[in-house]
Amino acid sequence: MRENYETLVSVGTSELLPLSAFLSPAEAGGATSGESHQDKGQKPHLEHSSQGEQPQQSLHLTALVQLVKEIPEFLFGEVKGTEDYSESGSTSLDGEQTSPEVAVVVEACPPRGLLNSLPESPASHPSLATTPTGSSTSGGPPGDWAHGSPLPAIGTDDKPLSIEKEGVGASRETSIHSTQSLGQSKSYLRQERGSMGTGTLPENSPLQGLINCLKEILVPRPQHRGTAPDLPPSLPGLSVLKQTRAEVEAGSLPCPVKTEAASGDCPLQGLLNCLKEIPKAPDRRPSPSGASDLQLQEDPGKRHSGGMRHLQTPPHPSHEAGSMLATVKVEDGWAQSPPVPASCQLSRQGYSSYSTGDNREVRVPRWGPMTLASRASSSPLEALEACLKGIPPGGSSPLQSLAISWSRSPQLGDAGSQRFELQQQGSHSEEATREPLLPLSLQGYMREGPGVQPCGSQGTPTSFSSASSSDGDLDFRSPRSSQGQRLGKGYLPGNSPLQGLENCLREIPIPRPQAAWPCSSAVNRGLKRTEPRNWTGDREGLRGEASEPPHLRQRPGEVPSRSLHQDSPQTCTSTCHQVTTRPGTWQWPQEETATMPSPLHRLENSLRGILPVRPLRFTCVTGPGPSPSPCSSSSFSSSDGEDLRPEPAFWQSPLQQKDQPPSCKDPVRLCPVSGASPRVNSNSCSAEDRERTEPRDCSSLSAGRAEEKPHPPRREDGAERTRQPGPVTNAEGKGAAAGHPSPAPQLEEKPEPKGTEDSRDLEPGHRPPSAAARTQGKLLSGDPPESPSKSPLPTTVLSKWSPTSLQPPCPCGRSLQQELHNLGTALTDKLDRLAAALAGLTQEVATMKTQMDQLRRHPRSLGPKGQGSWQLALPQRPRWVNRLGHRHLPYWRQKGPTRPRPKILRTQAEGCKTSDRPGLSRGKGSLVPQLPPEASLVESSRPTCSSSQQISSTPGGHTVLTAHPPLEHTACHQNPLSPSVPTSVQVPLVASPATSADTEPPAARVAAISIPNQPKEPDSLLGEALSRDLWGGDHRDPRWGAH
């Protein structure tokens, strides 16, 4: 925290030093008016220096300095001595005990008096530090409000608001200190404020409560210290809140923050004490989740001057009603903020409360970290300023949180949400669900907050100011809301200080926010990352500030929760975009970079750490969750990059780790397209794949997968994997299938070389077919190199292997996936061919129909041979049709009903049986009349369609596809010829089922199996696709029958 404070100081060194120097006299206590003068004199100077010297942090520091400077002004407005004293008391809580009542009396003036009261509040500002919102508010905003100019809407209301804020803070501190004189002063101040037109009863006014608290703090310094611990969150957060409010409301940070800065704790000891107590306050505050905060507010108000309670009540109504988001809301927010002695909560709740009610108040937990930051700073004014700056950071990240909070502060809703998130962390109540990402990105979103800044600047700033002063830590709690806005402006420039503060915040959030955030998001460290993951990640990774926290949260270990939950890389990207530090993104995932100004550095770091993990998460998400994780994770991990490698343990996919680089491309490409298919494939092959090569074996299961496996290695170790496709694939694919290396790669490669290989090669990196390819093999991209080299050689062997290796591991699923992929690629070509074939086939069908009608009669009269063969063909055909393509059944049935046509063709074929063409008779799916079996296979789509191939079985039972002569296929019984056809030809062409089964069981079966599992050759794929579509049915029918 001290480092954070130092960072904050360094961020606003000139401002801080002037404030310190300015406050030092005030702290001396002797120069009440002198301090006031110093405040005033230095106020412009500090303001100038803070704004001029440090435009980045100047927003915070300038606001703080201005507030401090204006505190004397406001106090001077009525009674300089009192003002000086109050500010002096604020500055040196322990030393300055000039009667706070004097300051209160001095502030009797409605506008001036109110502001004077506020300066008095600054005097008791340490008490404000003690009081979550009231003290800080009175310290920071009082002068600011009195200033009025910085807070346009607060003009007249400004002071009342400031008074209210201070009243609230005072109420808190009063409750803490229970000083009746303070209560009286508060009543007086409130009366004056009421006359001033604040519309809040003098007693109920938050300023009055703040004044009372300040008086109590100033008079009983020990009590103040007790108060400080009692309401520690108020000072830092309030100061920050004031800054934010002043900035947001007035459009400039000067007054609000300045007041708080001016009222820096005696030596920030009061503030530090408050901060120390802040963790306690947040602890109890989180329990009530806002209600407790109100109670705290109420209690302090009751025990001190009952005004605080009123303040609490008025702030809330005002807060809710506050039409002037900036001014009135600030007032209300401040008023409300003090009611939450937890203060950070209230101030957050200020704008948050008005937007979400008291729930935000419960965001006290943030004050814990803020408390740490505040404690860290012990200089009187510097410590106060550092607390103001670092209070939000203390809770979230010293300066970063503040900057984020300010940046976020403008977005009322967002700030509220953030506050909600923080509150959620504190109370772990409805807020957690409602805005998990905000808390998670609270810091990250704080970065984003600047984007939302305008929204919250109206009301959030007010509440933020209150929270900043009174709930400095709470400001941290909602650094996005209140801190982000301010820092949103200036924290980027002060990135280096902010980064130091960020580091501090990262450390700070971890100790306490982790406890608080875990409440809401620690449920599932890994899984909770989905929503709270960001929170948890932010706090976990100490990058909680960055919007990246979500991404960081989605660390390798965390990826599963989001990845598994989110099935698509898109979701993962948007949700996991925030890695360990995470987004929101996560949305996406890029929000971390785009919307995390909180600390730019932190954002960068978070992005560095998160981006790799998040893609992995996306990959994981894209992959089938935990079960399919191996397959999808394998390719996704590759696509995600190296970060997923840590996740492999989570994903249970060694292949991920091994194949992360190789899959790098594929997963990205596959994630979107193959999100569902890979899951299906992974699910179907999940068990077996895990057994063999959990991730890669899934690929191996699908013929293309094994090839793809080697190919991804090809990316990684293209040569090595290509050389060792089987072993590498298995080893990479989880090394589970040590015995399957050769078969799996061969099988996969074998089919792939023909059709899948080409298609996958066409889409090595990101083609949609890669979804099927990915399901078949996660490493589609790697397929082409190995597939070509391996597939040709193992085509025959692989076809043999295919039946054995492919069948055991989800042959159907993989075959379907491969076929889908092949059909996607080859189907297009085949469809084109089919279109042409259909054109000719239509004519042929018409002719065939006519002939069929005639031949129906003829075949009937032809005799048992024709009928028997026709009958055989008919039954086999339907079977083949069903086997080949269930989806193609309609086409086949359409043609199936035209069985006479096949009969006609077969009749003609019978006539030409002697001259039967083996390729045609085999009906291997040759689209073109196949004199050679191979040629017929290549042209299978055309002959199949054109001949409306009649499936006839010879007595031997071999199914023969008879092509109509017009189809350029002389329908001939393939039964005898198919055996005669070279085995090599039959294998590639996948001889008719009967032929494959009877004549050449090994080769034909291998070919048939390999084809169903995965078309090996492009022609085979085309034939398969065609058979599935329409024409390939006959060709595929035999294959399917064999399959």
From Swiss-Prot:
The keyword Methyltransferase does not apply. The keyword Glycosyltransferase does not apply. Residues 26-56, 113-186, 279-321, 413-497, 528-590, 621-816, 910-929, 1010-1043 are annotated as: Disordered. Keywords: Coiled coil, Phosphoprotein. Transmembrane segments: none annotated. Residues 172-186, 566-590, 788-805 have a biased composition (Polar residues). Residues 36-50, 156-167, 528-551, 687-697, 705-723, 747-766, 1031-1043 have a biased composition (Basic and acidic residues). Residues 126-139, 630-639 have a biased composition (Low complexity). The modification Phosphoserine is found at S99, S181, S252, S352. Pfam families: KRBA1. InterPro entries: KRBA1, KRBA1_rpt. Residues 825-858 form a coiled coil. PANTHER family: PROTEIN KRBA1. This is Protein KRBA1. It comes from Mus musculus (Mouse). The gene is Krba1.
